């Protein structure tokens, strides 16, 4: 097959930025006060995307029947041993996360050096597995810097696994306020219609249907209040019984799906306002 000659060379097309990265950039332009937080988030998200391209799609050696049975027993679907972590990649990602947080002054020099030492520790796999199991219990973290770094390090591994599992089994009958995938607490919620709320795990980004009138922390159904912000795009459900709150995005009013990194940064001022009233994130 022949093609007609071209008079001039065509300029190469610019590759479009991924939606999440473009939305973060637009957020910083619209709200310059959020630019430092956006810059940090863009570095984290870019590193995650690069790692996930190298890792490919994970495979969990468990049948759909076994997954359904676990849900019925109230057990989380992803145990640490099933993830098959690539430890050289994990250690590299941990170093990258620590370096990013240090550049943005989230960590001081001493803390960064300590966390780099942990990343080189031969006992790192046991440390991470213990963190994974303790995070499912929802208790206070003894070492918040390590907890934050491990959460960011494991996220590209865990979110991809959660995506795969969520395609294989429905979690809509899961009755708990903790994630059916990894057992952690919700970090956000999605409102698709009035009274219909899906919680979104703060650790693996797994989703599950949960009663919009019930607090996922204490399961109280008569002490919740809901506030709207940003013209109703965001909502905050606060519980007067346990003093916890969960943020949500109304996807119809937003005109787009939840973008976890974008919406987390976009609602930082909302977090501060709710915390000033004595509430803590779930």
Q: Where are each of the predicted segments found?
A:
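Long C-terminal interaction/binding lobes of large macromolecular proteins
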Residues: 1-2
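N-terminal alpha-helical interaction blocks
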Residues: 11-166
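Cys/His-clustered metal-coordination modules, chiefly Zn-binding fingers
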Residues: 156, 160-274
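Extended, helix-rich structural scaffolds rather than catalytic motifs
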Residues: 278-281
